Amino acid sequence: QKESTLHLVLRLRGGMQIFVKTLTGKTITLEVEPSDTIENVKAKIQDKEGIPPDQQRLIFAGKQLEDGRTLSDYNIQKESTLHLVLRLRGGMQIFVKTLTGKTITLEVEPSDTIENVKAKIQDKEGIPPDQQRLIFAGKQLEDGRTLSDYNIQKESTLHLVLRLRGG
């Protein structure tokens, strides 16, 4: 009796398969749940491939996936293919100073886009990216550009200005 109930619960939750394609062209199949975090997925890749999570960058639909988010947050469904890029050098830290004087520390890569950086700020502070304006060396930073495009290096400080709705 107990067993059949458990079985039913598992069937209802239902896992799904996704594929992870590496730069060498190898495809790894993973069993996941929509509620799995990206961190969980990286742990599964480590189990299969022995690659430490901190060396993994996962890309889906051109976006780099953030550890704290879930597969369903990114609308990753069964049979979706993620791309795995290895992060060889360590990342770097940058600082983001808000108007209230608070300083946020972020782990980034020179190849991260401004959009990625805004997503990281959202994860830490809960501020939606469309309300964020980032300023560096007096310039407003464009979403599609990367940190290296602006010559933003480790320990650089960006300034965060909030864009109020409308206007």
Curated annotation (Swiss-Prot):
Glycyl lysine isopeptide (Lys-Gly) (interchain with G-Cter in ubiquitin) cross-link: located at 21, 26, 42, 44, 48, 63, 78
What residues correspond to the site Essential for function?
A: 83
Return the annotated site residues (Interacts with activating enzyme): 69, 87
Glycyl lysine isopeptide (Gly-Lys) (interchain with K-? in acceptor proteins) crosslink site(s):
91
Q: Cytoplasm: present as a keyword of the record?
A: yes
List where in the cell it is found.
Cytoplasm; Nucleus
InterPro entries the UniProt entry points to? Ubiquitin-like_dom, Ubiquitin-like_domsf, Ubiquitin_CS, Ubiquitin_dom, Ubiquitin_ubiquitin-like
- Transmembrane ranges, per UniProt, are none
Which keywords describe this protein according to UniProt? Cytoplasm, Isopeptide bond, Nucleus, Repeat, Ubl conjugation
The record ties this protein, via PROSITE patterns, to: UBIQUITIN_1, UBIQUITIN_2
Give the protein's function: Ubiquitin Exists either covalently attached to another protein, or free (unanchored). When covalently bound, it is conjugated to target proteins via an isopeptide bond either as a monomer (monoubiquitin), a polymer linked via different Lys residues of the ubiquitin (polyubiquitin chains) or a linear polymer linked via the initiator Met of the ubiquitin (linear polyubiquitin chains).
Which family does the similarity line name?
Belongs to the ubiquitin family.
Additional info? Ubiquitin is synthesized as a polyubiquitin precursor with exact head to tail repeats, the number of repeats differ between species (up to 12 in Xenopus). In some species there is a final amino-acid after the last repeat. Some ubiquitin genes contain a single copy of ubiquitin fused to a ribosomal protein (either eL40 or eS31).
Please give the name of this protein: Polyubiquitin
Originating organism:
Xenopus laevis
